[in-house]
């Protein structure tokens, strides 16, 4: 029987494999969530560089948020990331949710990024 960690690793590798198949040179929007915060960054895998990033630990957001672990915080991170991506000239990305299920905070961040102008 596979452990919980094995299942997460297998799911993450499956998602990354699918992303590589459809990326076509587009940067990826990678999302990570912990129990207290949420982090997102846009990564150019060809160059191996981070183009834009945002998290609930940013000084721009930290003072305005009650906590970094709710959907309101994820929405704020998504909007901030979309704003920073547009300044960097990025419109189209591939969404990399990793091993996280597309629900709750991950979904809130993705929808806010779409509203902010990112296409995925």
From Swiss-Prot:
GO terms for cellular component: cytosolic large ribosomal subunit. GO terms for biological process: translation. It holds the Pfam family Ribosomal_L18p. This is Large ribosomal subunit protein uL18. HAMAP family: Ribosomal_uL18_B. Coiled coil: none annotated. The keyword rRNA-binding applies. The keyword GTP-binding does not apply. Part of the 50S ribosomal subunit; part of the 5S rRNA/L5/L18/L25 subcomplex. Contacts the 5S and 23S rRNAs. GO terms for molecular function: 5S rRNA binding; structural constituent of ribosome. It comes from Rhizobium meliloti (strain 1021). It comes from the Bacteria. This is one of the proteins that bind and probably mediate the attachment of the 5S RNA into the large ribosomal subunit, where it forms part of the central protuberance. Keywords: Ribonucleoprotein, Ribosomal protein, RNA-binding, rRNA-binding. InterPro entries: Ribosomal_uL18_bac-type (IPR004389), Ribosomal_uL18_bac/euk (IPR005484). Belongs to the universal ribosomal protein uL18 family. The gene is rplR.
